[in-house]
């Protein structure tokens, strides 16, 4: 299971090597409650967002705490870093349970969106 997560992360890294993430788009994804859903659990530097999560660590300073590769891994396979996490994998489509038919076989975010979020989180020093 862990090897599978690592291979997904490595595959994503290779697939996105040519993609440069856009931090502006990444911020929009993180703040969008219909796309990233990050603020359901996390808080961060989003003064315009009234309700932010308290379940997970703040995103403020994420770029100081983790490298871009570590941020990517946290999005792609968070259970590899913390087996007890409740954070979903944003780039996993197989081996999931209780997935609505409309979402089966689909990732939450595309490879480009993952890179955008990584680029944004890396700016949070």
What do these predicted ranges mean?
Residues 1-2:
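N-terminal secretory signal peptides that target proteins for export/translocation
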Residues 26, 34-45, 71, 117, ...:
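The canonical Cys-X-X-Cys-His
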Residues 39, 60, 88:
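Cys/His/Pro-rich metal-binding microdomains
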Residues 74, 90-125:
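C-terminal capping alpha-helices of c-type cytochrome domains
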């Amino acid at each position: 299971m862990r090897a599978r997560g690592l291979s997904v992360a490595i595959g994503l890294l290779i697939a996105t090597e040519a993609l440069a993430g856009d931090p502006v788009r990444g911020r929009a994804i993180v703040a969008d409650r219909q796309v990233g859903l990050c603020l359901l659990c996390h808080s961060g530097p989003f003064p315009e967002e009234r309700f932010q999560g308290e379940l997970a660590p703040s995103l403020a300073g994420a770029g100081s705490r983790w490298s871009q590769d570590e941020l990517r891994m946290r999005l792609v396979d968070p259970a590899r870093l913390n087996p007890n996490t409740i954070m979903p994998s944003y780039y996993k489509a197989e081996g999931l349970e209780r997935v609505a038919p409309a979402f089966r076989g689909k990732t939450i975010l595309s490879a480009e969106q993952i890179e955008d979020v990584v680029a944004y989180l890396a700016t949070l020093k």
